[in-house]
Amino acid sequence: MSSIFVHLDDNFYIGTPKGETPVDSITGKFVNSVREYLEQNGMTVTAFARRIGCLERCVARWLNGTNIPSTEYVIKTADALHWSVDYLFERTDRAAFMPAAAPSSFSERLHALLSSCKENKRTLARIWQVEPSALTKWLNGSRMPKPDTVYKLADFFNCSMDYLLGRTDIP
């Protein structure tokens, strides 16, 4: 996949040709949403990076497919744009979401969802194709899963990514 330069307002941003999905299809949905936002708002990567509180080179690398955003940066993006994470990942057509009255952490939500699950942690780790130690780190709050894993967990629990991430109280 070759990178191209698109000229916007005397600045450049790095991107892939429209229609190509960088990295993988789940992360590609997020990247496509960011790319569309930049195009529709005539915004540069520099301005966008400032808006979400991220380094310009990080955003450029998301757009050219050399890096994937962390879940923390996905949340920062959603917060800065006042959009749902599910909208950024093309899981819903609605950008708006109802913020949680008292936001929860990912680990709190995961604990709550696991309490009604019949499977043990080792089985779930195998189903989710992660190491059991990763699940332990998610549960104790020392690590967040990658965005594509959050997407898959939301599918597994039949809830929104925003609910799983503690951004809304609506599953």
Language-model segments: what does each one mean?
Residues 3-43, 94-119:
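A short, Lys/Arg-rich alpha-helix, primarily the initiator
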Residues 34, 71, 110-113, 121, ...:
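Short, structured motif recognition centered on aromatic/hydrophobic residues
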Residues 38, 49, 78, 114, ...:
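The alpha-helix within a helix-turn-helix
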Residues 38, 63, 73, 89-92, ...:
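DNA major-groove recognition helix of helix-turn-helix
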Residues 39, 53, 64-66, 93, ...:
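Residue-level detection of the helix-turn-helix DNA-binding "recognition helix"
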Residues 41-61, 118-137:
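Short alpha-helical DNA-recognition segment
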Residues 58, 68, 84-87, 123, ...:
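Residues in the helix-turn-helix
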Residues 72-87, 148-163:
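DNA major-groove recognition helix of helix-turn-helix/homeodomain DNA-binding modules
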